[in-house]
Curated annotation (Swiss-Prot):
Gene: serS
Organism whose genome encodes this protein: Lactococcus lactis subsp. cremoris (strain SK11)
Domains: entry comment: Consists of two distinct domains, a catalytic core and a N-terminal extension that is involved in tRNA binding.
GO cellular component: cytoplasm
Subcellular location: Cytoplasm
Enzyme Commission number, as recorded: 6.1.1.11
Protein name: Serine--tRNA ligase
Quaternary structure annotation from Swiss-Prot or TrEMBL: Homodimer. The tRNA molecule binds across the dimer.
One Gene Ontology term of the molecular function aspect: catalytic activity, acting on a protein
Length: 423
């Protein structure tokens, strides 16, 4: 959530930055007008309350003198009625103001590329060689079905579209991957967590999913309103919601593997086959809590942690800086890692690493006490390390052999009981 004081102090500058994120200036102008009206009413209300206190003192003095205080009582009743009316108007204005501000995305960092959509993203680097085949490479869904390790037909029967069963070596490969990822992040100082897979709506608000992206989630239809997590970012970030941390302990780094549940409301017709876009998938998440002056160094380190997984798996990838028009709601800067998918002859997103600066911390009230004892908002960061199903897809396609078998990457063989080939 943005700081209303910052908007007030630099309205035109903030409006220009938000315009690069698709926010119309009219919305900011409405917010600006409401803020002015709100401050005017606060001044008026405080003046009337001071007047009411003064009249109350007069009434007490008159009554002590056994005099007639009816005039003062009538005056106080009139002032009280005015205060009540102003406070009611103030409450309505604050509600309207809040409705606007909670829907505004984060301000982009100065290094974030300005652009309308993914076409304006900027490639930062490419790492690794894309494989060459002396045969036509198959898509991972065909490989998985032919090997009997991925079953979409029965997943669809049991649940519906965009669900599947992992079976045998497929299930073991999935498990091997997330155990490997967690072990690697543990070596980098991340504390491993097992989180709740359902959260309350305050938690969804804290990380910025609610209210703007409510349609993208699965929510329990009872009076509790719990939500199946779309990413472990939500419970991990909200772990410290409403708390003040010791600045000397920052940065704090968490990692967790969890299922992620997404309705994919706006994805009809996109990636209808395979592991790229599912309603339920496993993902290893990284979350950091950092001091503001250290957060961009921590973003580079987090991105390197995600890259480390791809490098050790021997997968070719590229790093892309997302444009203002393609970046997530809560992010100030985002790097996407895109892995090479041979059957599609392109790179596909497998990780997204973001610095949210104090945007989530303000929504969730996560603060720290610095060395001078001052309490201030910290910065939050999150990143995939990695999306497990998409990593399975990348391994199946990049390590396929002409006979349809899959060579297991060497780094994963200890996690798969020494298995060298899936056939």
């Amino acid at each position: 959530m943005l700081d209303i004081k910052k908007i007030r102090a630099d309205f035109d500058g903030i409006a220009a930055k938000l315009a690069t994120r698709g926010v119309e200036k009219e919305k900011l102008e409405k917010l600006h007008d409401l803020d002015i009206k709100r401050r005017e009413l606060i001044v008026k209300s405080e003046a009337l309350k001071a007047e009411r206190n003064s009249v109350s003192d007069e009434i007490s003095q008159v009554k002590r003198a056994k005099g007639d205080a009816s005039t003062q009582i009538a005056a106080m009743q009139k002032v009280s009625a005015e205060i009540k009316a102003i406070d009611a108007e103030l409450a309505e204005i604050e509600e309207n103001l809040n409705e606007i501000i909670i829907m505004l995305p984060n301000l982009p960092h100065e290094s974030t590329p300005i652009g309308a959509d993914e076409d304006d993203n900027v490639e930062v680097r490419r790492v690794g060689q894309t494989p060459t085949f002396n045969f036509e490479p198959k898509a991972h869904w065909d490989l998985g079905e032919d090997l009997g390790i991925l079953d979409w037909e029965r997943g669809g029967k049991v649940t519906g579209s965009r669900f599947l069963f992992y079976k045998g070596a497929g299930a073991r490969l999935e498990r091997a991957l997330y155990n490997f990822m967690l072990d690697e992040h543990g070596k980098e100082g991340y504390t491993e967590m097992i989180t709740p897979y359902m959260v309350n709506q305050e938690s969804m608000f804290g990380t910025g999913q609610y209210p703007k992206f409510k349609e993208d989630t699965f929510e329990l239809k009872d009076d509790r309103g719990f939500v199946l997590i779309p990413t472990a970012e939500v419970p991990l970030t909200n772990y410290y919601r409403g708390e003040i941390l010791d600045g000397s302990e920052l940065p704090i780094k968490f990692t967790a593997m969890s299922p992620s549940f997404r309705s994919e409301a706006g994805s009809a017709g996109r990636d209808t086959r395979g592991l790229i876009r599912l309603h339920q998938f496993h993902k290893v998440e990284m979350v950091k809590f950092a001091k503001p002056d250290q957060s961009y160094d921590e973003l580079e380190k987090m991105t390197a942690n995600a890259e480390n997984i791809l490098q050790k798996l021997g997968l070719a990838y590229r790093v892309v800086a997302l444009s203002t028009g393609d970046m997530g709601f809560s992010a100030a800067k985002t790097y996407d890692l895109e892995v090479w998918i041979p059957a599609q002859n392109t790179y596909r997103e497998i990780s997204s690493c973001s610095n949210c600066e104090d945007f989530q911390a303000r929504r969730a009230q996560i603060r720290y006490r610095d060395e001078d004892g001052k309490v201030q908002l910290l910065h939050t960061l999150n990143g995939s390390g990695l999306a497990v199903g998409r990593t399975v897809a990348a391994i199946l396609e990049n390590y396929q052999n002409e006979d349809g078998s899959i060579t297991v990457p060497e780094i994963l063989r200890p996690y798969m009981g020494g298995l060298e080939v899936i056939k």
